[in-house]
Amino acid sequence: MAKSHTLNPEEEFEEESGLRPSLLSEFIGQKEVLNNLTVYVQAAKNRKRALDHVLISGPPGLGKTTLAGIISNELGTRLTITSAPVITKGADLARLLTSMGENEILFIDEIHTLPKKLEEILYPAMENYMIDLVIGEGVTAQMVQIPLKPFTLVGATTRSGLISEPLKSRFGIQLRLDYYNDEEMKQIVLRSSKILGVLIEDDAALEIGKRSRKTPRIANHLLKRIRDFSEVEGNLSVKKNLCLKAFEKMGIDDLGLDGMDRQILDCMIDRYKGGPVGLKAIAVVVGEEEKTIEDTYESFMVRIGLINRTPAGRVATEKAYRQLKRMEDFSVHHGQDPTLF
């Protein structure tokens, strides 16, 4: 796979590529997505035509960029990676589209942030492999159609609800990635440890997986930090006891909550008696952006039952109080007898 990093200065794909699976057969988890994608890719190969445009949605770190790379590898074609926030002008998008070779893949991350005027450039490009450009200004301006080579747009989003219906409907293939289970996370840690040359016991890999918020990207980051602790202590292999000590030092609990998670929950409990409370109020208190809280922290805590989203705002659940060992506060806030807890 040849990669082009147009308009992507951070090159995050390269930084993590060593641990990313490169083929569908190497990808762990997301069975339904993989089974369907295998069929779609094979059909495109058999027809020797561009794969239908693909929209991949789901929380951060679950493998959206990785799947774009896998599609490119499986089809044996070039992948160009960019992100919607850095495409600010129609000329940027036109340059990307006209640079695409036949059946090549254009990956646009955070596609839900693409401005409407740029979306409208994509419509004919996705449907008819054409773009309409205005040449000149004023009364002399002319609309010129520029043909494109057949290509596949792979869009990734953490907020599929923010994508306009006209754009969403042009993706013939729509895939949703979900959080991984503990066994899948363990297998991901074992695979990554082999690539990194880290000897690790199964129960240690499971412990890392359980504290990785059901997210492979976080699992890989934690594995590297556990490796640091293990090497400094002079251990030949990573054991569960070392993981437990390292996680305690890093402030990561048995559910994978870190300091910011606890700060968010403490804010809800201490200032708002558990809620309901608005996202903006939480963001002001903890000093973090609303989008970051919603995408990175809150979505996971909602998933595991620590926060409920209600029409009136966010509410900390009984499980959240229990996890923070604050059941006396729960009884006070909910008018119950503290001795019950």
UniProtKB/Swiss-Prot annotation:
Family statement: Belongs to the RuvB family.
Large ATPase domain (RuvB-L), as annotated region: 1-180
Gene, per the UniProt record: ruvB
Domain of life: Bacteria
Comment text on domains: Has 3 domains, the large (RuvB-L) and small ATPase (RuvB-S) domains and the C-terminal head (RuvB-H) domain. The head domain binds DNA, while the ATPase domains jointly bind ATP, ADP or are empty depending on the state of the subunit in the translocation cycle. During a single DNA translocation step the structure of each domain remains the same, but their relative positions change.
SUPFAM superfamilies: P-loop containing nucleoside triphosphate hydrolases, Winged helix' DNA-binding domain
GO cellular component, one term: cytoplasm
Residues where Mg(2+) binds: T65
Binding positions (DNA): R309, R314
Species: Leptospira interrogans serogroup Icterohaemorrhagiae serovar Lai (strain 56601)
Protein name per Swiss-Prot or TrEMBL: Holliday junction branch migration complex subunit RuvB
Ranges for region Head domain (RuvB-H): 254-341
Sites where the protein binds ATP: L19, R20, G61, K64, T65, T66, R170, Y180, R217
